[in-house]
Structure formats: C-alpha cells, structure tokens
C-alpha cells in the first residue's frame, strides 16, 4: 500500500457513532465501513482476546459485559474501564486506549477504501470540550497511528460542510446538534471565511439513546400489562432485541405516523413464548418523550443570551446529529427561532465529518480563504492569594490567543512561587478543575508585592494550553504545557503506540475472523427467519434439509474456531441463495426465499 503523506482524513469521533471523510477531487467524500455503512457505532467489545469495534460490538452491547459504550464521556479524566480476560483476570484500559481502537478501525477501513496509508487527521470535538479532553483526543489519535493536525469544534465543522463561509455577508448561525449521546447548541459568527464561536451550551447527558430508552420503557410496560407483571429488564437477550426494536421504531416515526413493533419469541415463560406485537404512533412517541425534548429548549435561550443575539438576528439554522430527523425536534427549533426553517440539506449524521475533511483540505492548501476561530469553552485562571481563581483567558475567548498579566509574591523574601492553573467559572480555585502546577524559583528576596512575575497563557488553535512564568528582574522562567488529566506519561503513550504497531498484523487477522464470524451468525439468523416465514411451508423438504445442514455447519465452525470451514459454509449458503433466486425468480427479481 502506497503512502500519501499529504492526505488528511476528517473524523467525527462521536459519543454514539463516528464517521470518516476525505477530500477527493476537491469534494468531501464520506467513506463506508466494511459493513457498507457510512457511520460506525463508537462501541468496543473485548471477547476472548479479540477486539471488536463498530456494528459487531453493538450487536453484543447488552449480552457481553466487556462492551464499552460512550467512552467519549470519560475523555480527559483519570477514570479507567475494566474488562475481564478469558482466564478471569482483569485489565484496566484508559479512555484514550479505547478511543484509539475506534480511531484505528476508522483509519484502517479508510486506508482500504483509498488504497493508501494514512497518517494525518483532523478530529472534531464538542465546543465545550476542555483542555484535558482535547489533549486526550490527540493522544488517542497518536496511539492509533495518526498525527492529529487539528482539533476543531463540531459546530464549526458543520458550518464548513454547509459552505456558509462562501457567503459574501456576515452571518449568525445557530447549530443545533442532537447526537446519540450528547446535545449541544452553538452560535457562530461567520464573515469573509472567518469562523468565530460566540457561545455554546448543551447537555452531555442527553441524546437519541434517551428517546430509545423511553420506547423500551413503553414496550416493557405493555409486556407487564399483557403478561401478569412480567419484568424483562434483567433478561439480557430480550433487552438487546428491545434496544434494536426501539431504535428502529424511532427512525420509522421520523418518516411515518406509526410504527409496528414486532418481536416474536422475545422470551419464554411457563405459559409459553412471549410474542410482542405493538403499534406506536408518532403522537404517543412525542408524548412519552416530551420532557426530553424540553431539555433542549434552555440551551438555545442560553446561547442567544450569552451572545447578546435576538432570535430574529439569526441568519441560518443548521441541524446536526441523526436525532434531529425527529419532526418534534425540528418544530421546537423553528418555534424558538421563528422565520427560519432549519437547513437539512446535508445528512446530519455525516455533516461534522465532512467539515473535518474540508478543514483537512484547508491545512493542505486545497481549500482557500477559510480561517477558523474557535473559542475556549471555560475560563482559564491561576490560583492567587487566598485561593482565588484569577482569570487570564475568559470563557468564549477566540483562539489562538496569548494573554499576560503581572503578579507578585505573597510573603516577604519569598524566593519561589507555585503557579497553579485551573479551569472553570467559579471564583475560588478549589471549586474549579485543576489542570496543573509548576514552580518558579530563583526570585531575589524582596518585600512582598515588590517582585514582578509575568504569567503568560498561550492557547493554540487546538485548544492546547502553555503556561509560562517569568521573573522580570532575574529573567528566570519556567513553563508547563497542560497535558490531559488522564496522567498518561509519554512513555505510556509510546508503549501503547508500540503495542498497537506490534499487534497490527495479528489484529488484522482477528478482525477478518470477526467479520467472517459476524457474517456466519447473520446467515444463521437469516436462515431461521426463512424457516419461520409463512412461505417456508411451501419449501421442499430437501431445501429445508440443506438449510439445516448449512446452519449446523456454521454453528460447528464458529464453536470450533474453524474459519476455513466457516468460509466454506458461507459460500454454500450464497450458492443456495443464488439457486433459489433463479428457481423462484427466473427474471432476476429476488423473491422471498432468497431474502
């Protein structure tokens, strides 16, 4: 595989789903994953020393306790997740390591699609992400073998994708982003190719998954009513199917007024099988999720108030995230910003990745006349006398930026000072997030308040903070670059990179085997559906026997980890399907037996 050192992919590393895009012939193109989908669940499963990412991991989300979801919520923290090894021992993983598995999966299939080795990326983050979270994202990219050229805010990426920078007038743009696991609202000012985030607000514990959960509660209540209080909330297999059915129903209700939830043989009780056949109307769906929708109202008001912008001054509304397809969401946004219909011309699941790819084009020089001016999401301060947090860079300051301020000593003849850096809006340093500290020594003894110590905060375009302290009398100085709060040393990062590289070939083999296993399991499920369908009664006995034989062969191959046999059985099924297609549909139109 050839290497293109100039190629930069754009990655939307989402809480629930991720997406990768690249510039081809001057246009952004979203790349499909091995399952033919344009977005990939941000889910990682660990099973028998295998690492499973994406849709395959999602399918075992409930049944496999070693499945990790929403790892993005832990970025920038010292929290770790624990997984069990086959021998019963446990292993702790940092959020960066888990996120790196997702990024590595995206990188690998992008390389296969493009046919070139990829080493550079632009990755998006929520506008509210702090310095630690941004650093953690860069570290995850590094572990995955990616040089993260730029971290950009998701709303900025969305505006880039919509080409609003091409307008010849200044525009105020509201970006409403309701993803699977988080909700953000941002207000951007765009003029002459320059982007500035004026304000941002949101709820990082609200997303489309919450709408799914309301449907699950609705179904569980129906089951309890119909089956004498039956509670399936602890039945892992049943909950996995309920989760999938709820998501399907939510999607259907965005396009139609009712959805049929059909779950045959959901479980078996003493009285026999439990079958669910339930109609959910859009009106009922909106009723049971009304409180969730209302939680998105205040953040819209907050960003308008903070930016001192009236609703009528908004020029454009952009909807981001698959959950914005829900009609109730669109109605709420229109009601709060009257006179404007939200722009939905780009797939909301893909728009952020597309914007990231365009930013990659900007960095390469392929896209001209675009300047991104993001903002810092929280105030950056130092702790001064009495534990006060004295701000140097205030919240929503445009970055990159550098700010300096003169401080002095708190005691007579003090020969050193501790510089404590914190982040947050609280007036006392102890109530804010501590980012780091360092010591400046060699100060000439003098009465307190006499020495002049210059503190400089420099925040780069990626939101990475460098803090420098300088004694203006002695010219002595010291500095610190704030690293992520996960406390990963460079040695630990390098070890993770080496481990990833050393295991790359093995991981590829494992991934291919997982794909085979997934295909085999999918075929078994398909065969069971065929045999349970009404049309199955018309099948000749020998055809049913063929299917039973294929099913048995696949199950045996999977249990024995015999991937050669598994591949052969998969081919047997494909041949059978082709024969059935010709037999039942000589004109080539595939009918029911070939489904």
From Swiss-Prot:
Which UniProt keywords are listed?
ATP-binding, Chaperone, Nucleotide-binding, Phosphoprotein, Stress response
Question: Which residues are annotated with the PTM Phosphothreonine?
Answer: 182
In the induction comment, the record states:
By stress conditions e.g. heat shock.
Which Cys-Cys disulphide bridges does the record give? Answer: none
Which Pfam family, an example, fits this chain?
Answer: HSP70
Q: Which GO terms describe its molecular function?
A: ATP binding; ATP-dependent protein folding chaperone; unfolded protein binding
**Which family does the UniProt entry place this protein in?**
Belongs to the heat shock protein 70 family.
Q: What function is annotated for this protein?
A: Acts as a chaperone.
Name of the protein in question: Chaperone protein DnaK
Species this protein is from: Mycoplasma pneumoniae (strain ATCC 29342 / M129 / Subtype 1)
For this protein's source organism, the top of the classification is: Bacteria, Bacillati, Mycoplasmatota, Mycoplasmoidales, Mycoplasmoidaceae
